[in-house]
């Protein structure tokens, strides 16, 4: 491919968001978003060449109608390597751009460990076949959690926080539960969360790992598609009803998921793009659909990996928001990786306030007291009439500007300050935080400077109001209207974040 296009005499520049010359990248999958300026009617593709470890990776990617492009590269190698130099060359029409940066895998004392949960089998399967399936599923989990790690970094960088993402503790490990497959399939997701959390805490391998959080997938998830087909009810609720040993639930130190949607997930890096764009229709008589009614493999992949981002956010102490990853937006993960997709108008997810979600915690870390609270989730779908024209326009602009998949400002502040996401954090001895609510003065006081205060609804952890404290202060006085919700109606609780990453939930009846 030549650097110029025959017939085009314009001078073009290639612009790249976030990645800058001499930058340091700390996550192994690198997502690059950019554009050709000004637009070129002749150029259809951009050529990208990444030089790393004396080898070249080349990609040709399509430009969108607005001359935008996205690229995804795999930088992975031994996690113990020193910083490696990388060189990225981009060419399109007359535009050329060269960026030199370094890749240094993240190091932090606070990590996330992937687990593949195996329950006790009543009937023994062939050992070799079972072990092979476990290896394949662990590899699939590893790849897709690396993508989640990349997306967290990409979206937090877009919010102004560089190198903020979680550190993986290593590859996915098989975890043997004390629960049988029959018991798991007879349990609801709240009970599964409690049982598996207890198993992890009681295990010799993981029980004393206070600086680990876990992302776990249940191996024996089963879908009764025949019953769904017989009922002719293909609603989200009915499909979910016929999933056994399934969960999508996060909080404290554990984010727990089923494995029934792995059919739509990529097993290898080269398959990621094809999986996210896969328009194959889901045969609901055989496979469960979880795509927010898109009914495609790509929709299932987007919604279920988006759900991993959402539930993992709860493990990082995030509440619910109306929009973005922690609200209605996690279905739109496909838009993070693609360009020129049509505007999507999906049914709204509503908070399931009846769900008594898991209240146990898998971490004994005193700084995460708020993460053990019950968190109802955006699990139900509300089918609505065609949106009004102004709503359609709002949707278009939202999806055009930030993919509809983003962390709202308050969530980004929490994540940027959180110990599990701050870069290169050692197991340092920090001043123990003492955070209190003083009813007499309607104040929140702390011995560590306050960074953010949120007021969240008791029923669904939806953030009603937040206050970002940019100046170092040890006191925050709640406005009268917020104090009324907290102390008089007692319909809300306060979530508090300090500058050293301590978090605490405060209510009027708590000390």
Segments (PLM) and residue ranges:
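Compositionally biased low-complexity segments, especially N-terminal hydrophobic helices
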Residues: 159, 190-193, 357-370
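Active-site rim elements
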Residues: 135, 291-302
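Fold-level signal for large, globular catalytic cores of enzyme and receptor domains
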Residues: 243-245, 260-296
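Active-site recognition of the HExxH zinc-binding catalytic motif
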Residues: 302-319
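Eukaryotic short linear interaction motifs
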Residues: 121-125, 224-226, 264-265, 323-325, ...
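Beta-strand-enriched, solvent-exposed domains that form extended recognition/catalytic surfaces
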Residues: 2-110, 434-511
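Propeptide-to-catalytic entry region of secreted or membrane-anchored zinc metalloproteases
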Residues: 42, 53-254, 259-262, 272, ...
């Amino acid at each position: 491919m030549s650097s110029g296009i025959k017939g085009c005499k314009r001078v073009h520049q290639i612009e790249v968001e976030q990645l800058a010359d001499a930058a340091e990248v700390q996550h192994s999958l690198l997502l690059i978003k950019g554009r050709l300026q000004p637009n070129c009617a002749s150029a259809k593709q951009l050529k990208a060449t990444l030089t790393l470890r004396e080898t070249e990776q080349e990609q040709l990617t399509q430009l969108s109608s607005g001359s935008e492009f996205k690229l995804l590269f795999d930088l992975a190698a031994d996690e113990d390597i020193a910083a490696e130099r990388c060189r990225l060359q981009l060419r399109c029409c007359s535009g050329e751009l060269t960026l030199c940066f370094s890749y240094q895998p993240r190091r932090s004392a606070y990590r996330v460990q992937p687990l593949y949960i195996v329950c006790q089998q009543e009937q023994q399967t062939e050992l070799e076949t079972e072990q092979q399936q476990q290896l394949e599923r662990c590899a699939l989990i590893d790849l897709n959690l690396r993508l989640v790690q990349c997306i967290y970094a990409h979206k937090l960088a877009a919010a102004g926080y560089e190198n903020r993402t979680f550190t993986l503790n290593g590859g996915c490990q098989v975890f043997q539960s004390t629960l049988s497959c029959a018991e798991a399939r007879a349990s609801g997701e709240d009970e599964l969360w409690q049982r598996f959390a207890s198993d992890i805490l009681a295990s010799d391998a993981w029980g004393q790992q206070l600086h680990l959080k876990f992302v776990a997938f249940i191996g024996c998830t089963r879908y009764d598609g025949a019953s769904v087909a017989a009922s002719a009810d293909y609603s989200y609720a009915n499909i979910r009803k016929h999933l056994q040993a399934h969960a999508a639930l996060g909080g404290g130190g554990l984010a727990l998921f089923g494995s029934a949607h792995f059919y739509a997930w990529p097993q290898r890096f080269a398959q990621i793009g094809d999986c996210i764009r896969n328009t194959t229709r889901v045969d609901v008589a055989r496979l469960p659909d979880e795509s927010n009614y898109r009914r495609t493999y790509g929709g299932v992949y987007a919604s279920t990996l988006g759900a991993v981002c959402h539930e993992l956010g709860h493990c990082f102490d995030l509440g619910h928001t109306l929009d973005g990853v922690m609200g209605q937006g996690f279905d739109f993960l496909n838009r993070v990786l693609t360009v020129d997709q049509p505007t999507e108008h999906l049914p709204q997810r509503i908070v399931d306030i009846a769900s008594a979600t898991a209240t146990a915690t898998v971490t004994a870390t005193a700084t995460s007291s708020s993460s053990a609270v019950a968190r109802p989730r955006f699990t139900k779908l509300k089918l609505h009439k065609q949106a009004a024209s102004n709503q359609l326009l709002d949707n278009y602009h939202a999806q055009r500007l930030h993919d509809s998949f983003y962390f709202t400002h308050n969530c980004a502040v929490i994540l940027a300050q959180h110990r599990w996401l701050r870069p290169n954090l050692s197991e340092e001895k920090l001043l123990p935080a003492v955070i209190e609510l003083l009813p007499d003065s309607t104040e929140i006081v702390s011995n560590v400077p306050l960074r953010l205060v949120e007021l969240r609804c008791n029923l669904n952890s939806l953030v009603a109001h937040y206050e970002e404290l940019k100046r170092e202060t040890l006191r925050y006085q709640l406005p009268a209207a917020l104090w009324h919700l907290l102390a008089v109606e007692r319909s809300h609780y306060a979530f508090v974040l300090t500058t050293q990453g301590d978090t605490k939930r405060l209510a009027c009846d708590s000390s």
